[in-house]
From Swiss-Prot:
Record's keyword terms, sorted: Chromatin regulator, Metal-binding, Methyltransferase, Nucleus, Repeat, S-adenosyl-L-methionine, Transferase, Zinc, Zinc-finger
Major subcellular location class: nucleus
Protein name (record): Histone-lysine N-methyltransferase ATX4
Residue numbers binding Zn(2+): C965, C1015, C1017, C1022
EC category: transferase
Region annotated Disordered, chain positions: 75-104
Compartment list: Nucleus
Domain SET as annotated: residue spans: 885-1002
Keyword Transferase: yes
Catalyzed reaction equations: L-lysyl-[histone] + S-adenosyl-L-methionine = N(6)-methyl-L-lysyl-[histone] + S-adenosyl-L-homocysteine + H(+)
ZnF (C2HC pre-PHD-type) residues: 646-680
A cellular component term, taken from the record's GO annotations: Ino80 complex
Amino acid sequence: MIIKRKFKTQIPSLERCKLGNESRKKKRKLNLGGGGYYYPLNLLGEIAAGIVPGNGRNGFSASWCTEVTKPVEVEESLSKRRSDSGTVRDSPPAEVSRPPLVRTSRGRIQVLPSRFNDSVLDNWRKDSKSDCDLEEEEIECRNEKVVSFRVPKATNLKSKELDRKSKYSALCKEERFHEQHNDEARARVDEKLPNKKGTFGPENFYSGDLVWAKSGRNEPFWPAIVIDPMTQAPELVLRSCIPDAACVVFFGHSGNENERDYAWVRRGMIFPFVDYVARFQEQPELQGCKPGNFQMALEEAFLADQGFTEKLMHDIHLAAGNSTFDDSFYRWIQETAVSNQELNNNAPRQGLLKKHRNPLACAGCETVISFEMAKKMKDLIPGDQLLCKPCSRLTKSKHICGICKKIRNHLDNKSWVRCDGCKVRIHAECDQISDRHLKDLRETDYYCPTCRAKFNFDLSDSEKQNSKSKVAKGDGQMVLPDKVIVVCAGVEGVYFPRLHLVVCKCGSCGPKKKALSEWERHTGSKSKNWKTSVKVKSSKLALEDWMMNLAELHANATAAKVPKRPSIKQRKQRLLAFLSETYEPVNAKWTTERCAVCRWVEDWDYNKIIICNRCQIAVHQECYGARHVRDFTSWVCKACERPDIKRECCLCPVKGGALKPTDVETLWVHVTCAWFQPEVCFASEEKMEPAVGILSIPSTNFVKICVICKQIHGSCTQCCKCSTYYHAMCASRAGYRMELHCLEKNGQQITKMVSYCAYHRAPNPDNVLIIQTPSGAFSAKSLVQNKKKGGSRLISLIREDDEAPAENTITCDPFSAARCRVFKRKINSKKRIEEEAIPHHTRGPRHHASAAIQTLNTFRHVPEEPKSFSSFRERLHHLQRTEMDRVCFGRSGIHGWGLFARRNIQEGEMVLEYRGEQVRGSIADLREARYRRVGKDCYLFKISEEVVVDATDKGNIARLINHSCTPNCYARIMSVGDEESRIVLIAKANVAVGEELTYDYLFDPDEAEELKVPCLCKAPNCRKFMN
């Protein structure tokens, strides 16, 4: 073997990439040590035999792993054929190849035989560097063939194109392989040198070169290989082509084992691989990457540098769509540069030669293309077929048969049809379409076999019909399939595209429809991504791909006529079918604390909060359309007029609430749900009934999953900022931000309802409906200072706090201990420092619950709570008779005496009435001044601007209730008829026995600083002052 170039390879040590196995680490240390050792050629396997990475002098840029020698079987066949045909006579026997000339570990040099005495060898002991970038090496292989290679100094794969403009070109004529290379290549050496010292550009590299490249400014340099974008890059990469940039493929895998990353790299972001290994293995940008990924990419690059590129080349051509790529063809073409005589005698390659007998002929019309024109051709279709300009334009416009892949040119006189789905043209005879049927296709839609295979599913009416070719005869509008058989983790199901739901066929789920993610968990799939795990049974296509193709088909399909709107009867049947699905009702506790529609606590003289006498819901008169109501004592809501019939909202699963009838019989809706459906409105603005437009709601709204109740029932509304869906009533009760925008456009008032999800606005249980007007926004907090608002507010409470002496104060006793004196109890003893709440019990300590002791009092009859009352006056009378069974007084943990629960009180239950003397507002002001002068506590509760309840002298036990910023009770003004109102305390939450009852006094917050009353509730959200 004659070698004119030092074949020295130095592999650096990778200190940052640590391996877990200690034995592997030692082994790698032995092989990859950076001590300047020579890499013996006999350890490279077949590289010494001729499998050298890079392109030879024949200039085939597409071949990265070119095999110079023919297989042994082919060689034996060739020698036998020569001997039989007499072409080669007296051929000498093949000599046994000697081991390559290497430098041993002791530094000795093997001496060549005498027949190589005329060869010139480099001195192994002199590591002198040449200034030329290209060095020749001639390798004599085992089969006595000599092939010249030009291997650049930077990388082993950096070779050579005949023309600078065609550095990504494909095949060339074999007659011109050698005549232009020697002269033109050396003439362009100066042009390929970097323009600036230390920087490289795309013009310095060719297809197959190993490089270091970076895809972005903050990205690390990564091992990559330069490819020919016209033949080896996917279509998506070609569309994002960047001028004056090289197309590279990074080593390593980005996703699974077949996905790789591509990039267009400009000048300054690309360097030779071997020369810059030591520089780029210690990059600071690699701190954010996994060392294992960089280690694997680096090892794959070293393997490619040694010629092992079969897997890499397969992945690149597979991604580029070159399904007909054959590596043996390029190897055989390169062998033709060695010996034209052996080309004619190579029998096993004759079939391949016949297939590519004229590389410069157009694959479409077989027109001969000149060599100069072939070098400029850039339009190649998958399979490396050379096309002329007319055929390339036809290929771009999809004038190519989707079955036989033949181009539709002027020489083709066959009948063609075009698919209405993918817009691909197909020969009629390729799809076996007769001439008679071809005439019928002019009036209907046609779909190619690929589209029919992708969307081959069963329909509910007939399992033999094909969904993609199912077309409405009346208007040509495509019809969605009713159902599709899908499979996930071996479990079958029926997918309904219109509902986006699945019915499981496992046998235990029944006919219940489930969401795709829920059904995926039910099947036991571990992927947690139904878009890829759920597949169509017939075509084995992922459901997401099936949906995308279906959407594309619908977008491409052109309807000849506007689709006819379904009749009212059909829409009603469809709506009732949606509502017949099983669901879990949401049982809500409706209290009188706030309006069930707008959730405001305040009311006004012209818009009072009225309470239903049966279901106990509280609504504003204007919110419910009850402006004409005057008798508030016996008023019942619309749903409670017929208590024997249960009314439920058809737009949400929440039971109860402020319901209104619709124009569809037996269907009711919440006022809130109707407000937040753009298609629904009320026929009468004054009465707010009936709700019309229920049948106009899109069907897609009935199949959305509410993010709050996690159910599919009714119609969901959407967040104005994102695609989050929820029921309007669920969002209202969860404290979502909901707004009513009032606008005026062209002299007409426009109302728009807007809601926000939990991500865009933080939910708050005290949120109310915010009214946005051109003059500003109105909420409950902004209207606290409205003096016309009627409210249950304690307007005055004066309590003089005795100043407690300091604990460490020592008082001197002037008397002796023997003298008898009157015992004085200390008010603030050490035992009462913590101010614990102690209810007052007259029976001493007890070891049993109050309810258990109450059952022993058989002599005392405790009346049961009636289920219903005919009027509020009757309810109030019952409340007065039983108030001592519910509450008692005791020492408060907040201030002085307090009010305590004698038994468990449920949320929304009326506790007791706040009784006292009702006086005019002017009289209340005079009494308050008098109470202040004498230092007496005063308890004044305002019902309205004209009426105030004074419980200072003539009140009941309710006046002992203390203030808290987190109360468990609230006050509500009840009308008992004849323009008479009462104040009732109602439980805001469940109150346990012995727990202190508190209420928010709601003092006016605009008091002066000197009139501020400190708060002593010690609540986490304490406001520090009551006003």
